[in-house]
């Protein structure tokens, strides 16, 4: 009978796993779901520094050029002397090989910054752009504006899977990064109503975590553990955010607790 043929699959565990996978892949689209943005700084010697932001509704902020410095936060580095270089310079230069005439290379600041968005972001409205060491879009503050003349926006973001996007930019040691990353919302729900807007602002709390990695392999392992999208330096998608059938939607996955 057709009914009997349809019921040959009695793998209850697989059915449960499929339901779990479906639940995870729809969860980021629920109103109030968490957004997760990762700003990944790659340094000339192959080290990585990741700024991990989580919040509902929107993520906005700025990372100063001082925060991009690898040694930022150490006791010998402080914000009182903005124009001073790190006193322990030997920790932040690479010396040329023996016999080479190349000068030492400063590895304090990143040469590449990648932005990875995970969640139901409104990509058409997401913007990110460099600012100078004083947070300005022009060296003359009187000509500085709220947005850069050419921010990363809309179709410049490259999609990864269901709900992740990324962009890669070259960087300068005296630049910071400003980003404005809103979530998608129901068009019938007016976020700009005064009461609604006040509630959204009140409920939106941004959390930042900073991770240091000595190489890309460590970075890939962390992104994979946390179920975050990550395209590696060869533009290969090394990790995806959506759940699949190989384990990152598993009921017994311990990484979701840490």
Swiss-Prot record:
Keyword annotations for this protein, in alphabetical order, are: Viral occlusion body
Q: What does this protein do?
A: Major component of the virus occlusion bodies, which are large proteinaceous structures (polyhedra), that protect the virus from the outside environment for extended periods until they are ingested by insect larvae.
Q: Which residues form the signal peptide?
A: none
Provide the assembly information: Forms crystal-like bodies by self-assembly.
According to the UniProt record, one GO cellular component term is: viral occlusion body
Q: Where on the tree of life does the source sit, at the highest rank?
A: Viruses
**In its UniProt entry, what is this protein called?**
Polyhedrin
Is Iron-sulfur among this UniProt entry's keywords? no
Q: Do you know which Pfam families this protein is assigned to?
A: CPV_Polyhedrin
Q: Which InterPro entries match?
A: CPV_Polyhedrin
Q: Does the keyword ATP-binding apply?
A: no
Membrane-spanning segments: none
């Amino acid at each position: 009978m057709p009914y009997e043929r349809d019921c040959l699959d009695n793998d209850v565990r697989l059915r449960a796993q499929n339901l779990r996978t479906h639940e995870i892949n729809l969860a980021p689209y629920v109103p109030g779901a968490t957004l997760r943005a990762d700003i990944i700084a790659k340094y000339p010697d192959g080290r990585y520094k990741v700024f991990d932001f989580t919040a509902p509704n929107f993520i906005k902020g700025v990372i100063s050029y001082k925060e991009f410095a690898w040694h930022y936060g150490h006791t010998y580095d402080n914000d009182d002397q903005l124009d001073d270089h790190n006193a322990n310079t030997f920790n932040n230069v690479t010396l040329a090989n023996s016999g080479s005439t190349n000068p030492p290379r400063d590895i304090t600041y990143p040469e590449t910054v990648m932005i990875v968005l995970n969640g139901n972001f409104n990509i058409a409205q997401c913007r990110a752009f460099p600012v100078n060491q004083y947070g300005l879009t022009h060296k003359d503050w009187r000509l500085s504006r709220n947005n850069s003349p050419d921010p990363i926006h809309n179709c410049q973001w490259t999609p990864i899977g269901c709900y992740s996007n990324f962009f890669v930019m070259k960087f300068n040691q005296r630049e910071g990064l400003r980003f404005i990353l809103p979530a998608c919302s129901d068009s019938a729900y007016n976020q700009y109503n005064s009461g609604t807007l006040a509630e959204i602002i009140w409920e939106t709390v941004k959390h930042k975590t900073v991770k240091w990695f000595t190489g890309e392999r460590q970075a890939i392992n962390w992104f994979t553990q946390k179920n975050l999208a990550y395209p590696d330096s060869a533009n290969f998608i090394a990790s995806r955010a959506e759940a699949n059938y190989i384990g990152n939607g598993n009921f017994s996955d311990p990484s979701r607790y840490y």
